[in-house]
């Protein structure tokens, strides 16, 4: 067999059996102008997201973790078209997301839905669940003859009965309200769900129920998740792959098991050590600094106990030779 024919056959099998990339971030940046107390002074630039690169394959569950202000929710807003990237491109099913939105907004939102952090706040308090679902169905352009069957189907998916259709949001517990929000998101049969801290406002016991439900639906319905969270235990439970962000930049990414058991970046180590454990004494000694974050080097430099002058230069990127999907950006991996 000639080399050209081998390449063609190889490409065929690769495309046939490898999952399709459903969402792709290509060098995405997002900047904001901060508010200034003096009208005459120059407004400083806040770099919320810097050089974000990620390919999300169909059926995957990617977790995006980091402390508050690292750019997680900004990413979610850009995926939903609520914010535009300052630089770079976001592709959905190989088409530029912003073009997709401008050409057919309804089609895009049928494929991409979002579940928010506070379930009750994201539901109209003046409407019953039935009315909320009806509005979503009309908005998504779902055929009239499918209305009842779609509602029954999504309620069954989230383990709720049809009786809740006549109830108002304030009549539900936090867990029930979040199930309603998930059901609403499923009405249009989306391919991608963006979940922004979907269980952080719930009790721990209720969190477990919702996470189990989300994992079950992903496997049964073939959904893809972009899961935004600051809770590492939640991400470990539901996400197959994880991105760790700090100050708008990716510092480590890869399979979730690798991130938790064989992490390389000092910030990932700090995040994992910050999780409280009953009976374990609190450790001190982590470096706290008010130094500005370097523009070119590692953003964690001012707080890192392993930092050297080389960290102020362009960040060093490396990966696990046994598992190239596990990548980190650090000159001195732990």
Residue spans of the language-model regions?
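Conserved ABC transporter NBD signature motif
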Residues: 88-99
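A short, proline-enriched helix->beta-strand linker immediately N-terminal to the Walker B motif
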Residues: 187-191
